[in-house]
Amino acid sequence: MKAAWYQKWQVHRRIRPEEFGGHLHNQMSELAEYDIHAELLTSPVLEIVYNQQESYLLPMAYAEGCPTHPAYPAGHATIAGACTTVLKAFFNENFVLPKPVTVGENGLSPESYHGASLTVGGELNKLASNIALGRDAAGVHWRSDSTEGLKLGEAVAISILTDLKATCHEQFRGLRLTRFDGTTVIV
């Protein structure tokens, strides 16, 4: 998290979607003037939102609204990227999950899964992505906050694993993992 907090406060200080929505609302209501691209200010979606909400603001998923710290990078995504990277380093990513199940149509009963093979690495990547992108849908982050947070967490984890490698007294042949971009790394 230290890497994410450094980027949030010392480098980027990016506003959150909720705050940008407030800027847009204030400009459309002629309460303030911001440097917002004309294409957005003339978008037909604004009239649709205003007619439904009686405001240019969209409802938030969280009653308390967004956190008050900067958006970029997403802390949840950074942690998810780091944890997933460490797990992929220690477990066989190519292991195929035997007899996977999916949720049945009633939402309660498990049914056999018959799609493509599910691997440990693929499922870990999906988990990290779900953790990262879930807060985008809630209006708390921009997509780039999450995708770059995953990459930052991955880089931090690889750096820590590399540092720890030097402290290993036993014969160590390295750890192999697949990065989120599909490239292979040997630590």
Residue ranges and their predicted role:
Residues 1-143, 147-187:
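Hydrophobic alpha-helical bundle signature of multipass membrane enzymes
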